[in-house]
C-alpha cells in the first residue's frame, strides 16, 4: 500500500516528516531529559541520602555547569569543522548515548571516602555525564532539526514532539523517583538500582533515535532538496563574535538560560517543599501526577496557540500566566491545593518555550545567513545550549545556596522558619522574577515578521552568485 503524499506546507516548502519520523527523532530528547532529570534530583540525594553539605554541593554544581557550558562551545566547533562527506550529527547519538547510560549508575555510587574525597568523586562523575557525554549527544541532536527539513512548519512540529516527549520523560522519572527509591529501601543502594534502570532506558532511546534519524530530508526513499550547503569555515572566535552581534540569537541565549533556571528549580524544589512545608516528601509524586494535566494541556494547546498568535505572542501570554500564578502563590504558599493549582499553571506556562526554543534558534540561524552569509548551525546551537546548561546549573545551585545561607540541616524533624523562607525564595520568588524578565526580552524578538522577506533576499543573493 503506497503512502499518502505529504505535499507542501503553507509556505510552499516540501514536507518530509511522518509520525514515525517525529517519534524516532523525539526519543533523543527522551534520553536527554532522563539524564537532566536525574541530575536535577542529585542535590536531594547528596544532602539527604549521602549526607554531604548543601553549600559544597551547590558550588560543585555551578562549577560543573560552567565547565559543561564551555564544552558545548568546543563540541559545536568540532561538529562545524567535520570534513565534508561525513555525517556530522548522527554518529554522536551512539558515541555519547551508550557511555552516558553507564555513567548514570556511577552518579549514585558515591564511596565513603571522607568529605573531600566525596566532593572530588561527585565532581568528576558530574563533569563526565553533563559536560562530556550529555553535551556530545545534545549538540548534534539539536542541530539535526536544521538539516532534517526546510519546512518551518515541520520544524515546529518536531519541536513540539521533542518537548512533549522530553517533558513526559522528565515527569515520569520525577514522579517515580522518590516513591520507587523509598519502596526499594530509601537508602543509597535503592538510588543505585534506580540509576541502573534509567541508564538502560537512556541507551535504548539513543539507539532508536540513531536508527530513525537522517542528515538529509528524505521521504519514501527520495532525497528532497534539503541539505546543508558547503559554506566558508569561520574561525571559532570570529563565529562567536558574529553570534553576539545577532540580537535575536542573544535573546534566545538569555531566555533559554532563564527558562532553564526555572526548569532546574522545578526539578529540585518540589521534594524540599513537600518534605518541609507539607511534611511528607512522598507528596512530590502526587504533585508530579497532577502536573501531568497542565503538561498534556500545554502540548495540546501550544500548536493552536502558535497558529493563532504566532511564536512571540504565544510566549508572552505564557510568561504572563507564569508570573501571575507565582504572585498568587505568594499569598497561599502553605496550602497544598493552592501550591498544586498555581504550580500547574506555572508548569503550563513553561511548555511553549520548551517547544519553541529550537524554532527560535533556527530563526536566528537563518538571520545569520541573511546578515553574514553563513549559518554556523552547530556553533549557534552549541552556544545557545551554553545558556541552557548554565541556566539549569544555576537552577540547581540556587536551591543549595538558599539552603546553605540558612544553615540547612537535613537531620531535623521540623523545618525552622529560616528554612521555610529559603524554600519560598527558590520555589516562588525566583521563578516570578524570571518570568517578568523573560516577558520583557521576548517582546523585543521581532524576527518572526521580517524573516520571510529575509529568506527571499537570501534566495536572490544565491541566484545572483550561482
Residue ranges of model-derived segments:
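Membrane-embedded alpha-helical bundles of multi-pass transporters/translocases
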Residues: 2-466
Amino acid at each position: 500500500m503506497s503512502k499518502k503524499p505529504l505535499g507542501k506546507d503553507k509556505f510552499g516548502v516540501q514536507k518530509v516528516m511522518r509520525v514515525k519520523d517525529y517519534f524516532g527523532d523525539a526519543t533523543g530528547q527522551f534520553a536527554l531529559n532522563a539524564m537532566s532529570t536525574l541530575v536535577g534530583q542529585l542535590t536531594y540525594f547528596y544532602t539527604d541520602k549521602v549526607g554531604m553539605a548543601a553549600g559544597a554541593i551547590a558550588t560543585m554544581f555551578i562549577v560543573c555547569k560552567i565547565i559543561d557550558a564551555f564544552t558545548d562551545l568546543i563540541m559545536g566547533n568540532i561538529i562545524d569543522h567535520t570534513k565534508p562527506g561525513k555525517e556530522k550529527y548522527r554518529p554522536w547519538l551512539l558515541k555519547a548515548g551508550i557511555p552516558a547510560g553507564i555513567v548514570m549508575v556511577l552518579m549514585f555510587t558515591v564511596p565513603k571516602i571522607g568529605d573531600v574525597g566525596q566532593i572530588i568523586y561527585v565532581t568528576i562523575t558530574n563533569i563526565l555525564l553533563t559536560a562530556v557525554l550529555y553535551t556530545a549527544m545534545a549538540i548534534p541532536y539539536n542541530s539535526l532539526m536544521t538539516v532534517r527539513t526546510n519546512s518551518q512548519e515541520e520544524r515546529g512540529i518536531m519541536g513540539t514532539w521533542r518537548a512533549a516527549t522530553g517533558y513526559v520523560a522528565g515527569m515520569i522519572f520525577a514522579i517515580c523517583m522518590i516513591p520507587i527509591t523509598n519502596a526499594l529501601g530509601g537508602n543509597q543502594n535503592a538510588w543505585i538500582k534506580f540509576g541502573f534502570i534509567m541508564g538502560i532506558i537512556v541507551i535504548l532511546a539513543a539507539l532508536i533515535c540513531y536508527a530513525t534519524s537522517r542528515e538529509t530530508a528524505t521521504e519514501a526513499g527520495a532525497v528532497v532538496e534539503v541539505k546543508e550547503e558547503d559554506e566558508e569555515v569561520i574561525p571559532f572566535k570570529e563565529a562567536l563574535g558574529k553570534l553576539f552581534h545577532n540580537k535575536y540569537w542573544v535573546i534566545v541565549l538569555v531566555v533559554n538560560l532563564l527558562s532553564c533556571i526555572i526548569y532546574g528549580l522545578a526539578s529540585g524544589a518540589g521534594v524540599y517543599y513537600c518534605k518541609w512545608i507539607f511534611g511528607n516528601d512522598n507528596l512530590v509524586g502526587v504533585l508530579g501526577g497532577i502536573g501531568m494535566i497542565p503538561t498534556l494541556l500545554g502540548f495540546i494547546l501550544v500548536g493552536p496557540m502558535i497558529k493563532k498568535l504566532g511564536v512571540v505572542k504565544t510566549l508572552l501570554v505564557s510568561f504572563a500566566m507564569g508570573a501571575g500564578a507565582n504572585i498568587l502563590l505568594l499569598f497561599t504558599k502553605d496550602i497544598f491545593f493552592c501550591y498544586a493549582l498555581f504550580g500547574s499553571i506555572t508548569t503550563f506556562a513553561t511548555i511553549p518555550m520548551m517547544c519553541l526554543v529550537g524554532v527560535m534558534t533556527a530563526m536566528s540561524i537563518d538571520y545569520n545567513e541573511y546578515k553574514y552569509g553563513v549559518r554556523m548551525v552547530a556553533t549557534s546551537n552549541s552556544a545557545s545550549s551554553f545558556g541552557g546548561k548554565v541556566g539549569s546549573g544555576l537552577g540547581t545551585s540556587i536551591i543549595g545556596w538558599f539552603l546553605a545561607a540558612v544553615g540547612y540541616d537535613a537531620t531535623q524533624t521540623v523545618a525552622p522558619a529560616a528554612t521555610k523562607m529559603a524554600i519560598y525564595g527558590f520555589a516562588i520568588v525566583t521563578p516570578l522574577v524570571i518570568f517578568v524578565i523573560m516577558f520583557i526580552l521576548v517582546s523585543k524578538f521581532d524576527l518572526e515578521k521580517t524573516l520571510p522577506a529575509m529568506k527571499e533576499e537570501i534566495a536572490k543573493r544565491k541566484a545572483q552568485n550561482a
